[in-house]
Amino acid sequence: NTTVDILAIGAHPDDAEIGCAGLLIKAKARGLRTGILVLTQGEMGTFGDPETRRAEAEAAARILQVDAFRILDLPDARLEFNYENTLRIVEVLREWRPRLLLSPHEDDHHPDHVATARLVERAAFLATRPALFPQYEPLIPQPRHLTFPLSFQRPLRPHFVLDITDVYGIKQQALQAHGSQYGPILFAVEIVARYYGMMIPAAYGEGFLTKSPHPLTDALGII
C-alpha cells in the first residue's frame, strides 16, 4: 500500500509545482515519502486539453520523484467547498496517510484555490473520524496543514520561508514539464521565488503560512 509523509494538494495540474516543489524535493532528499493530489484535470485552462495536462503533470511528478500521484475528476473552474468533494479528499488521506498537508492559501484571486484550501482543512479533520471509509484506519493524529501563496498579483507575507536555492533548478524543470502552460509565466514564478528568498535572505525561497502553531523538536530550527 502507498503511504506518504507529505502530501501536496492542488486544484490544477501545476499548483503544487508552483507553490511547493522545492519543499517536496528537499523532503525527498531527506528520505521522506512525498505525494501530489490534483483535484481537477485543468480542463478550463486557457491552454491545453485534459489529456495533455495529465501527461504534463505525470512528467513533472517523475521529475520531482514523488512516491504517489493522482488526478481526480472534480470540475475545473467550478470547484465547490462541499461535503461530497471533501469526502473525495478524505478517502485519499485515509489511503495515503500523510503527516503533513500542503495546499494553496485561501486568500487568492482564483476561486478554485480558495475552495481547495477550505476542502483540505475540512478533510484533514474528517479523516480522523472512524465512521468514514471503514476499510481504512482513521488518520490519527490529524495531519498538520501548511498553505502556500499562488497569486502572482498579491504575494502574501509568509509565516516562514524555505530556502530552495539548491533545488531551484529541479523546480524549474518540473514547471517546464507543463509545456502547454508555461513561457512568460516562468519569469513570474522566479520573481516570486526571489521575493521570498530575499526575506531570509537567500537566492530563492518558498513561502508558507499556518493557522495553528507547529511544534519544534529542536530549538536550533529557529536560528
Where are these regions (language model features)?
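Metal-dependent de-N-acetylase/amidase catalytic core
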Residues: N1-I9, E80-I223
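Active-site rim/loop-helix segments in enzyme catalytic domains that contact anionic ligands
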Residues: N1-W96
